[in-house]
Amino acid sequence: MSEATKFTPILLGSDMNVYGMARGFYEAYGIKSIAYASDQLAPTRYSKIVEVRLVHDFHDDPVFIETMRKLQKEVFNDPEEKYLLVACGDGYAELLAKHKEELSEHFLFAANDYDLFKKLSNKVSFYETCEEYQLPYPKTMIITKDMVQDGKLDRALPFDFPVALKPANSVEWLDIHFEGRKKAFIIDNLT
């Protein structure tokens, strides 16, 4: 790698997305990535191409921004090097958007403005935006608590089965835990 392309990939998280990004950087540039995360997840546990550094509650503020400020001052401070931040998950993407102005002074990364991120990451306002700009999107029905009576939907679906059931807010969904929890559920019929 030439001096002109000297950079350090800093990946946020420790899941399969992080491993995939680290592999891409390693294959393209021959460099090892650094990752910061709250927990050590299996996909990166024994990897030789990414060094995972754990910080308790790193996925939450104020720990995230306080840690990034400290890293900027104490670790990632070589003026000859570029520091590339990559959010490998919705929660970290939200944190980068929230702190975009401050972090962009020292790190390189892509992030929406926070208000736009919030608008587009919530399925209700996302589909409203699609309608506003006449953008196509899959047939959708937003189900609210008052539409469910005795555990059953009180109206007919506007489309046939199978259907995908997803949370309206993928970032908030990360903090909800129960047996059988998934990113999306495929429902084949009414029973």
Give the location of each predicted region.
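Pocket-edge positions in alpha/beta enzyme catalytic cores
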Residues: 56-60, 118, 185
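Active-site nucleotide/adenylate-binding loops and adjacent lid/helix of ATP-dependent enzymes
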Residues: 119-191
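ATP-binding N-terminal substructure of ATP-dependent carboxylate-amine bond-forming enzymes
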Residues: 1-112, 146-150
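A short, structured active-site edge motif that brings together acidic residues
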Residues: 111-121
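Glycine-rich phosphate-binding/catalytic subdomain of phosphoryl-transfer
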Residues: 79, 98, 106, 117, ...
